[in-house]
Amino acid sequence: MRVSKYLLSTQKETPANAEVISHQLMLRAGMIRRNASGLYTWLPSGLRVLRKVEAIVREEMNKTGAIEILMPLVQPADLWVETGRWDKFGPELLRFQDRNNRDFVLGPTHEEVITDLVRKELSSYKQLPLTLYQVQTKFRDEVRPRFGVMRAREFLMKDAYSFHLDQETMDNTYHAMHTAYSNILTRMGLSFRPVLADTGSIGGSMSHEFHVLANSGEDLIAYSTGSDYAANIEKAESPMPTHTLAAPTEAMTLVDTPNAKTIAELVEQFNVVITKTVKTLIVKGATDEVPLVALVIRGDHELNEIKADKLELVASPFEFASETEIRAAVGAGPGSIGPVGLTMPIIVDHSVTVMSDFAAGANAEDKHYFGINWDRDLPLATAADIRNVVEGEPTPDGLGTYAMARGIEVGHIFQLGTSYSKSMNATVLDENGKAQVLLMGCYGVGVSRIVAAAIEQNNDDRGITWPEAIAPFTVGILPMNMHKSHRVADIAEKLYQDLADAGVEVLMDDRKERPGVMFADMELIGLPHVVVIGDRNIDAGVFEYKNRRTGEKQDIPFDEIVAFLTNAAKG
């Protein structure tokens, strides 16, 4: 492709409303343009990357034996009513009526449509297991679209759904999808981690997220330094204490703490060791009989709301009690709450069960107890894992310690069980002629999100540094002053044609532009391999080659350049 015949709409300045580097670079490199909040047009360079990502995803799906279909973006509301999600889904579900006043939605996901299809098309166990997938546009009316295509309202996604009668084939398909997702991201040249994830409101028995590692990632991943274990911070298991409860060495004393509303203030003003303090958090209870529950964690730890949400006594969805509710129940504000004397159920983190001589709120305004000890001052409460793990703690497999990394979720696989098939009566006859509800798996990849995530991981101060497999073009040719030099023009044209004939995707900048502009644009769009042609190089019989990712430069003889670049393009 010649730039003179191409739409290369680069921008020098960073757009003011672009918060993250991928959004900035996609706009500056002429990959996307904003139409409205969360809606984007993909320009030629962006679309080339998107299609390459899509092709790799499709190839790996086909290898698993999954069969491609295409479902409609517009879905009838009746299906959503059937599963109960018509009422459960919030305003992110865009609803509208056709001219006959029938309700429809723009699909944010396709579980209802695929389950409806399968219950009509499948009748026998002989047709199972079956995996169907599509690459389709989705729409979610996000309250605040941000980060460009990272969190857009309209996005491209691959979603696959598998159907089974037994757990064994479900597990086999799940494992195949796990492998396929790893292959997808490996082929794209991205650093990533599959992590154990919470199944959330969807439910099911197993869930993994696939995260592209990037410092700008919104998700915190806890992984083992000595094994493949990794989990989303909400799912990572905290280790059990390795020491036992020590005997008391202090008497419990009531202390006035008028200016200590937080653990940090208590530690600073009273010279207390933070690991000798606890935080008591009051949350909504699951029943009218138990309206409030106290959760107690060590002062330097953070409550894990996902773990707390799963506790039998705690309301789901998880919700903190209001200050009014706390004062009515305890007689003090949130900064003065502690476990001593509380009449509501108390659940403590495992780490708190081995604490002695610790400090906590006294359930009286501006007062704390110091020197609290279990059994002596209050009965040992029910214990559970309710906190986030901390870097350096042992991982549950015993093979390493926790380290932390930031990640961008680009894929998610679930074992759904019968969540949708049961509510929609999706059954087939088993070998005994008895109707059985189908087991389902769900496997999603954010195709357009991968593009942004790849840029978040692969960039420098000059622009994008594309991995080979998903770059818009493999080679960029920069002929210096070709409109003034016939030699440069002739050799550039020959190299361009030779590379095209060899199947290499090449972009030649044949514009009448200053060299500085040409170099800046080529580095901005991030093509992996750049060849510079000038009169001085021609005199020496070499091309100047630069690797965009490593910055390495070398001179390549004329007769070796095509073979060199062809091999480089193969990675």
Swiss-Prot record:
One of its GO terms (cellular component) is cytosol. Consists of three domains: the N-terminal catalytic domain, the editing domain and the C-terminal anticodon-binding domain. It comes from Shewanella frigidimarina (strain NCIMB 400). The keyword Transcription does not apply. It is found in: Cytoplasm. Catalyzes the attachment of proline to tRNA(Pro) in a two-step reaction: proline is first activated by ATP to form Pro-AMP and then transferred to the acceptor end of tRNA(Pro). As ProRS can inadvertently accommodate and process non-cognate amino acids such as alanine and cysteine, to avoid such errors it has two additional distinct editing activities against alanine. One activity is designated as 'pretransfer' editing and involves the tRNA(Pro)-independent hydrolysis of activated Ala-AMP. The keyword Cytoplasm applies. It catalyses: tRNA(Pro) + L-proline + ATP = L-prolyl-tRNA(Pro) + AMP + diphosphate. Homodimer. Its EC number is 6.1.1.15. InterPro entries: aa-tRNA-synt_IIb, aa-tRNA-synth_II, aa-tRNA-synth_II/BPL/LPL, Anticodon-bd, Anticodon-bd_dom_sf, Pro-tRNA-ligase_IIa, Pro-tRNA-synth_IIa_bac-type, Pro-tRNA-Synthase_IIa_type1. It comes from the Bacteria. This is Proline--tRNA ligase. Belongs to the class-II aminoacyl-tRNA synthetase family. ProS type 1 subfamily.
